[in-house]
């Protein structure tokens, strides 16, 4: 029984620290955040912080792993061969995941996030679903496939961040449809919206 209480306290402390880091990263770069500042916002002492994390970067890494691992799960649920050439189910789940983790995405992938982490996310999106999907349905030119994958992944990252920064007025479903239309029809999407 006592162990559950400790586990709950540990979870609560870690949650407070994650929220404190997200709050601070919304305002400034992680390199400008001190353990003292984090502990004050999380309402814990510095010693408690060091029980759980080596430093601010260790805490940041744990947050990044949570987001990245969740994206891997989303991507792996969608097999290119079983998708019948349709990206909507994948995009739908991807944008739902982004919606559910909007604060985390905003902080980790936004202006104060780490570019290396953004690259990691791009590689996950590319390598865990998109490349196989495009190679299976459009196998003609591997070099063009690489360019197209890079374009789609970067575009979707930017689209998601623009959506988050704009207050997420559209639903995840609407964003998935928009992303799919842009991927499949490019600039023609603007012609139909005008």
Segments the model singles out, each with a brief description of its role:
Residues 1-28:
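Basic, helix-initiating cap at the start of DNA-binding domains
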Residues 16, 48, 104:
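Residues in the helix-turn-helix
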Residues 23-30, 74, 78, 101, ...:
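Basic, amphipathic alpha-helical hairpins
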Residues 24-57:
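Helix-turn-helix
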Residues 34-35, 63-72:
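Short, basic, alpha-helical segments at the C-terminal edge of helix-turn-helix-like DNA-binding modules
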Residues 75-103:
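Hydrophobic alpha-helical connector segments
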Residues 112-138, 146-150, 154, 158, ...:
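Amphipathic alpha-helical packing segments from all-alpha helical-bundle domains
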Residues 134, 154, 162-194:
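C-terminal peripheral helix-coil segments that are non-catalytic and often amphipathic
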């Amino acid at each position: 029984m006592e162990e559950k209480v400790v586990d709950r306290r540990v979870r609560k402390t870690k949650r407070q620290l994650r929220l404190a880091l997200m709050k601070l990263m919304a305002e400034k770069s992680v390199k400008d955040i001190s353990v003292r500042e984090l502990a004050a916002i999380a309402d814990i002492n510095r010693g408690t912080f060091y029980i759980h994390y080596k430093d601010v970067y260790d805490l940041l890494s744990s947050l990044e792993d949570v987001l990245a691992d969740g994206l891997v799960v989303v991507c792996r649920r969608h097999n290119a061969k079983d998708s019948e050439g349709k990206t909507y189910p994948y995009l739908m789940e991807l944008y739902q995941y982004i919606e559910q983790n909007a604060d985390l995405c905003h902080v980790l992938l936004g202006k104060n996030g780490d570019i290396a982490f953004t690259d990691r996310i791009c590689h996950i999106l590319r390598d865990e679903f998109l490349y196989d999907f495009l190679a299976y349905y459009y196998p003609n030119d591997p070099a063009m496939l690489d360019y197209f994958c890079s374009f789609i992944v970067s575009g979707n990252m930017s689209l998601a961040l623009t959506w988050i920064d704009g207050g997420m007025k559209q639903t995840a479903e609407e964003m998935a449809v928009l992303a799919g239309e842009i991927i499949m029809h490019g600039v023609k999407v603007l012609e139909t919206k005008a």
